[in-house]
Every structure is written in structure tokens, then in C-alpha cells.
Amino acid sequence: MAKKSMIAKAARAPKFKVRGYTRCQICGRPHSVYKDFGICRVCLRKMANEGLIPGLKKASW
């Protein structure tokens, strides 16, 4: 889990636009966040395996 202070800092508008970054809405992870879902790869995989995201399933070939 991310620190509460870092999550609050990311929520504020940055002084310069290029300094903005995305965080996972569930765990607050700053890296590997999918913009389509708004969550990180770890949470996306967990939710997909539990069937919480409609239309998304684990690939097998």
C-alpha cells in the first residue's frame, strides 16, 4: 500500500502539467497503471481472476 501522504500529494494539481502521474485507485501504486481501467496490473490481474471485470479473462492458447 502506498503512504496516505503520497496518495494525497498525487491528488493535488501539480505546479506544471507534465509532473502529473496516475495512481491505482485501489492500492495507490504509481507504476504500471492502465488508464482504461484506472488500476495497476496487480489489481487488474486479481480482479480479472475473480471475475469482477466483465469481458476480461485469462488468455490460454
Swiss-Prot record:
Coiled coil: none annotated. Zn(2+) binds at residues 24, 27, 40, 43. Binds 1 zinc ion per subunit. GO terms for biological process: translation. The keyword Oxidoreductase does not apply. InterPro entries: Ribosomal_uS14, Ribosomal_uS14_bact, Ribosomal_uS14_CS, Ribosomal_uS14_sf. Its cofactor is Zn(2+). Keywords: Metal-binding, Ribonucleoprotein, Ribosomal protein, RNA-binding, rRNA-binding, Zinc. Signal peptide: none annotated. GO terms for cellular component: cytoplasm; small ribosomal subunit. The keyword RNA-binding applies. GO terms for molecular function: rRNA binding; structural constituent of ribosome; zinc ion binding. Gene3D superfamilies: 30s Ribosomal Protein S14, Chain N (4.10.830.10). PANTHER family: 30S RIBOSOMAL PROTEIN S14, SMALL RIBOSOMAL SUBUNIT PROTEIN US14M. Part of the 30S ribosomal subunit. Contacts proteins S3 and S10. NCBIfam families: PRK08061.1. Belongs to the universal ribosomal protein uS14 family. Zinc-binding uS14 subfamily. Binds 16S rRNA, required for the assembly of 30S particles and may also be responsible for determining the conformation of the 16S rRNA at the A site. This is Small ribosomal subunit protein uS14. The lineage of its organism: Bacteria, Pseudomonadati, Campylobacterota, Epsilonproteobacteria, Campylobacterales.
